[in-house]
Amino acid sequence: MDEIVRRYLVTGKVQGVFFRQSARLEAKRLQIRGLARNLADGSVEVLAQGSIPAVQALHEWLKRGPAQARVDGVQESDAADRKNEIPAGFEVL
């Protein structure tokens, strides 16, 4: 099965609301490898590697996030050049 690697930049009220931990649970459910980390500007960066349908499903989830979050936007970009950063599972940094 073909796999893709995507980078998502999630903006809004996404820090301090269990966004990264919730993203990790959703990624594990979808069998996606990757990571989520807070950035200094208040956004969250997510790197995701998995099947095309699974990564697309994670993208849709990121647009909503957990109940405590308020997602204002999600920017998506190809991240094939960052494949070496993807851990074996899904990590919260």
Stretch-by-stretch model annotation:
Residues 1-93:
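Intrinsically disordered, low-complexity, mixed-charge
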